[in-house]
Amino acid sequence: MKGEKQVFGTYEWAVSNANFINGCFHNCKYCYSKEMAIRFKRKTALNWDIEVVNTIQLNKRFKKADGPIMFPSSHDITPVNLPSTIIFLNNLLIAGNDVLVVTKPHFEVVEKICTTFSNYKNKILFRFTIGSIDSKVLKFWEPNAPDYEERKKCLVYAFNNGFSTSISCEPMLDDKADKIVLDLQDYVTDSIWIGKANFLIRRLKMNGLTDTTTIKKANDLIAMQSDAKIKLLFQNLSSNSKVKWKESVKKVVQLEISTVKGLDV
């Protein structure tokens, strides 16, 4: 309906978000949550990678939401916080919720979640963030997150163990999203989401990353995501039924943007 507010970000995927940690060890350079934490003085650029568990949130008893809940949205799941993650995820699931587990996956983490929650396969959808097929690119932008091979191993493991799987290629970290689709689509039961790097220079500056190398790579990445190149990518992948487009791409190619939270379309 005309005048209704378009949804973007995590609300394209879920009706609400759930988190229990302030900070993130992965310390991704482009991180929106880091930018917000610094802006509102909850963290600094220097201590963002030090994770602090919110024990009240960790022990929260959830109600059943009217749609999928994304977990986590402002931090990630690592081997260090895995024991607490199991508690928190269990609290979400026992309330009957459908949970979208979004992570730059560590194999130890995915293996543990799959074995612990094997009876909840119909309530969990994994969404593994993979912005490049090149581990060197991943290492630059996501310095403490797993390399490409480990992320692929996690996807294959979850798929082979009967879990629903999907990929977030948002942000794209180079101009090779089509190679990610080609290499991983056979292990995806749900969808492969593709999106641009949003507000990249602004976020890098807020996150304290203004060195010459980072800014140059950021400008190179922005150039890779010009409207012309996005339209070409869309043309090449639009016939693939597993590929979905984030709001940042939909604007460029003039696709309708949802006004309803959590439709995952």
Show which residues each predicted segment covers.
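Generic ordered-secondary-structure signal
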Residues: 13, 43, 73-76, 103, ...
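Conserved AdoMet/S-adenosylmethionine-binding subsite of the radical SAM
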Residues: 53-236
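C-terminal accessory regions of radical SAM enzymes
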Residues: 228-265
